[in-house]
Each structure stands twice: as structure tokens, then as C-alpha cells.
Amino acid sequence: MGVIEFLLALAQDMILAAIPAVGFAMVFNVPVRALRWCALLGSIGHGSRMILMTSGLNIEWSTFMASMLVGTIGIQWSRWYLAHPKVFTVAAVIPMFPGISAYTAMISAVKISQLGYSEPLMITLLTNFLTASSIVGALSIGLSIPGLWLYRKRPRV
């Protein structure tokens, strides 16, 4: 993949990630003045995850790093715009949730209950379930670590 193709794919990924970020921000009753920032933060998070995955990191670690970036930027923006960090960050990480792997794991579980046990279905179920669980864990831990670091009152040493 050339540089131009990568930049076009990155721009497409970031634009498409902004749409669900704004949608979920509207569901969570985020103030109208903060919707554009939720879209931008969702784009930054999903774009940084794509850059990290393209550079060779797996999806779990890329998601962890991207959610830490989203958490850090959200804390800074919350100081600038006098809002809670969750106003910006929660809707911004929703586009990174593992919908496909969770759906595939659920379909495999339904097939196992209908057709009975088979090793390929069980492997598919476990692989996708563990991937989805790891991504959700990376999102939640990565989003909470910047708050633990930046709001710490005691010295680190």
C-alpha cells in the first residue's frame, strides 16, 4: 500500500468513525457545543488505532494505546471547555468497540447450541470471544489510566 492509498484509507476511516461517535454522543445527551469535539476525538482515536495496526501492532495493543490517547486528550479538553472528561471520551471510544468479533462469537455459540459441539465452531467461538473481551478490556483500562495519572494528588515517587 502506497502513501497516498494509506492516507486516503486513513481519512476514510477517521470520517466514518466520527459518525457513530456523534450518534452515541447524541444518545448520551452531550451538549450541542461538544458534539464536534466528540466527532474529532472519535476520529483521532480510530485513526491512531489504524496507524498503530498498520505499523504492526495487534488490534488489542493498538486499541489500548488509542484509548489512552483519547483519555488524555479528553482530560485536556475537559479543562479547556469546563466539562467532565466523559463528555468527550465515552462517545469517542464507542467506534472502537469490537462488533464483528463479538457478533461472530455469538453466532458460533448459537450454532453450537443448535448443531451440537464441533471443534471448528468452538475454536471460532473462543478466538472471537477472547479477542472481543481483550479489546473491551483495553478500551476500559486505556480510558481510565490517563485519569489515574493526571488527577493524582500524591507524588509518584
From Swiss-Prot:
Any S-S bridges, and between which cysteines? Answer: none
Q: What is its main location?
A: membrane
One GO term of the biological process aspect: response to osmotic stress
Keywords on this record? Answer: Cell inner membrane, Cell membrane, Membrane, Transmembrane, Transmembrane helix, Transport
**Keyword Mitochondrion (UniProt):** no
Compartments (UniProt record): Cell inner membrane
- Give the residue spans that cross the bilayer: 8-28, 50-70, 87-107, 129-149
According to Swiss-Prot or TrEMBL, what is its membrane topology? Multi-pass membrane protein
Q: Which Pfam families match?
A: ThrE_2 (PF12821)
This protein's GO cellular component annotations are: plasma membrane
What does the record say about the knockout? Deletion of yjjPB decreases succinate production in E.coli by 70% under anaerobic conditions.
Q: What's in the misc comment field? A: YjjPB constitutes a split-type ThrE family transporter.
Family label: Belongs to the ThrE exporter (TC 2.A.79) family.
Q: Tell me, what does this protein do in biology? A: Involved in succinate export with YjjP. Both proteins are required for export. Contributes to succinate production under both aerobic and anaerobic conditions.
Q: How does it assemble?
A: The transporter is composed of YjjB and YjjP.
- What is this protein's record name? Probable succinate transporter subunit YjjB
Q: Supply the source organism's classification.
A: Bacteria, Pseudomonadati, Pseudomonadota, Gammaproteobacteria, Enterobacterales
State which gene encodes it.
yjjB
